[in-house]
């Protein structure tokens, strides 16, 4: 996905300038973080992937994982006593993108894994996250309020927080299909 592929007209409240500024990669060179906050379906993941894609084109090493993949990686390697290897995988890239933070409550110890990554990357390497949950919910979702507080304290210190609000892109295609099916003229034009 790219910034050029993004439908800017669908949610005009999403400003292009800050996103194209991020696409320069300066935030990565300066070891700053980025957080996309907003309702589901508004394009947060698309924008994060587009910025990751641009970073790769600019020569940066990028790792993209959902929060569920991250937790699964650590739980799997913890069972195999290989946690340091997994941690190194998350510390090495210039940019780590963690998608869907807060989609649902995470398993026990997830806060420890996320804290370790954020703490070790803090002011050294960039991290980008997407979330559809307000920050005050993170303690409950992580299951560890002190860990969530420490994560947010470090992560937000040098982070650019972008509110991505508007209508759901996913529901747009559904409503377009329903409108087309309900409109007999549209159906007759399509049938010709």
Positions of predicted regions on the chain:
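Conserved active-site beta-strand-loop modules that form the wall/rim of enzyme catalytic pockets
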Residues: 45, 94-96, 126
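Short hinge/gating elements
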Residues: 5, 34, 137-139
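Conserved P-loop
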Residues: 14-92, 141, 191
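Charged, amphipathic alpha-helical linker segments immediately N-terminal to NTP-binding catalytic cores
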Residues: 1-17
